[in-house]
A protein has these predicted regions:
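Small-aliphatic-rich amphipathic alpha-helix that forms the alpha element of a beta-alpha
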Residues: 63-67, 136, 142, 146, ...
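Glycine-rich phosphate/pyrophosphate-binding beta-alpha loops
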Residues: 68-75
Length: 238
């Protein structure tokens, strides 16, 4: 298979601009919006107990579209959001994830890590992967890849891909929370099985597994997870 590198942009490449579409808000409206958003996010929780109630797919689409507005290195947008609603595929993902997690908890977790996880009550069982109506797997495109008409490939470097995908994932979580849904960030290790199950291209690496839906009527969260650092411990003003 032939692989060609994209030419590196030079100073002769055309640089153009477009008007900024921005409406400045009155100070009162700005403050009201920021306070409302803060309250919404303060109520965000990582939820493992999902209702089987269907979620309108438009909510997922809007959340992914919002994530797609994230800034990225050289505006390369090196992410793919794989949305899985098929019960059979979700079952395969759960089976593989539980196998990896079972091995992790049995043979690889350190005493310090086990102690850190104890207040959260986590274990190898991942019912949320089949209970949630949708499971969204975020993939990082480690490098750009395009299949050519002659069967060859063209690939190119992606800059700050992991950092860019992390920002997009944060926007996705904020968007689903803003829409009244709950989610969980799950990172089984290793995660190569996810690309295999979904048949993703060879340039993609799983970044996070995010089940999304409505909370179960009897959902609970670890009390430990309610403890968030106060503003004074996370912000330094100069």
């Amino acid at each position: 298979m032939q692989t060609a590198e994209l030419p590196t942009p030079t100073e002769n490449d055309t640089y153009t601009t477009a008007p900024l579409n921005h409406r400045r808000l009155a100070p009162e409206e700005s403050l009201a919006r920021s306070q409302a958003f803060l309250q919404t996010m303060r109520n965000r929780r990582s939820v493992r107990m999902f209702s089987p109630e269907p979620v309108p797919f438009a909510l997922i689409e809007n959340a992914v579209a919002a994530a797609g507005t994230a800034p990225s290195g050289a505006n390369q947008q090196p992410w793919t959001f794989a949305v899985i609603g098929d019960p059979d595929i979700k079952a395969r993902i759960r089976e593989a994830a539980e196998a990896e997690e079972r091995d992790f908890y049995a043979h690889h977790i350190t005493p310090e890590w086990r102690a850190a996880l104890a207040p959260l009550g986590t274990d190898f069982q991942k019912a949320h992967l089949t209970d949630a109506p949708y499971v969204v797997i975020v993939f990082t495109q480690a490098f750009g890849l395009e299949t050519l008409s002659n069967g060859g490939e063209r690939q190119w470097k992606h800059y700050y891909a992991v950092e860019s995908v992390g920002i997009a994932t944060g926007l996705f979580l904020a968007a689903v929370t803003h829409a009244g849904l709950v989610a969980l960030t799950h990172t089984p290790s290793p995660m190569a099985f996810l690309a295999e199950i979904l048949g993703r291209p060879r340039n993609e690496r799983a970044f996070a597994v995010i089940p999304v839906g409505y909370p179960h009527a009897e959902a609970t969260v670890p009390a430990h997870a309610l403890d968030k650092k106060p503003l004074g411990r996370i912000m330094a003003r100069y």
